């Protein structure tokens, strides 16, 4: 460790690891170490960390569920951020709208919607990975994609500035968006249609087959 990483380690403790092996976070079980690996417990800790590293100009990489990520054997220079458990929260806002943390798995969102009689999110049960990654990639399958159910997202940039972005402010294209690389998605609001749990469950099963 150098002086700066030693200071970071003292400030963030167990949430920050130097030369962390990334293969354990990849579905492919491949990949070398991250120069600095940080797993913030919450938004405030993330903002504090970004403030600490700003002057060092570290390149920042966001690691989601690792389902669609190939990591070099030589590892990753700079900072790898993997959002912690507080970013996997999910809650019902209205009878057809939910708010989800960026780190929650797509399948869990689909099941939560099903259990609350919200349709149009069945396709998420077929997509590996997290909601944050799904938004960045405009993930979809079977004629549906996440842009159709996304109302808005909350993001934070590499300077620690938070903002809300509505669906119509994002340009979606096939398996991608125009969201800036320095944006870290914190959460999203998704809107489906009111339905019945049995109907939703049946559609999920049809899609998975």
Language-model-derived ranges and their functions:
Residues 16, 22, 28, 90, ...:
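Short clusters of hydrophobic/aromatic residues that line enzyme substrate/ligand-binding pockets
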Residues 92-97, 101, 106-107, 119-120, ...:
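Contiguous, small/hydrophobic- and glycine-enriched helical/loop subdomains that border
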Residues 106, 110, 124, 128, ...:
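Hydrophobic, well-ordered secondary-structure segments
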Residues 17-18, 69, 156-157, 162-209:
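Phosphate/pyrophosphate- and phosphate-bearing ligand-binding catalytic cores of soluble enzymes
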Residues 32, 38-43, 70-88, 136-166, ...:
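Structural signature of FAD isoalloxazine-binding scaffolds in flavoprotein oxidoreductases
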Residues 39, 82, 101, 124, ...:
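Residues in well-ordered beta-strands of folded domains
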Residues 113, 131, 135-139, 154-157, ...:
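Short, well-ordered alpha-helical segments in soluble proteins
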Residues 2-131:
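Anion-binding (especially nucleotide phosphate/pyrophosphate-binding) glycine-rich loop
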């Amino acid at each position: 460790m150098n002086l700066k990483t030693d200071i970071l380690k003292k400030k963030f403790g167990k949430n920050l690891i130097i030369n962390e092996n990334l293969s354990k976070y990849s579905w492919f079980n491949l990949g070398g170490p991250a120069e600095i690996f940080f797993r913030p417990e919450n938004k405030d800790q993330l903002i504090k960390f970004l403030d600490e590293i700003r002057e060092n100009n570290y390149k920042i990489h966001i690691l989601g569920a690792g389902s669609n990520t190939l990591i070099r054997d030589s590892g990753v220079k700079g900072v790898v951020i993997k959002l912690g458990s507080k970013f996997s929260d999910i809650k019902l806002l209205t009878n057809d709208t939910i708010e989800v943390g960026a780190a929650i798995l797509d399948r869990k969102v689909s099941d939560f919607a099903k259990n609350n009689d919200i349709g149009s999110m069945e396709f998420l049960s077929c997509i590996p990975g997290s909601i944050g990654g799904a938004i960045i990639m405009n993930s979809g399958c079977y004629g549906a994609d996440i842009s159709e159910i996304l109302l808005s997202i909350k993001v934070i940039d590499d300077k620690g500035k938070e903002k809300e972005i509505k669906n119509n402010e994002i340009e979606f294209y096939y398996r991608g968006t125009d969201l800036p690389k320095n944006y870290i998605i914190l959460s999203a609001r998704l809107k489906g249609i009111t339905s019945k749990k049995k109907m939703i469950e049946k559609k999920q099963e049809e899609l998975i087959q």
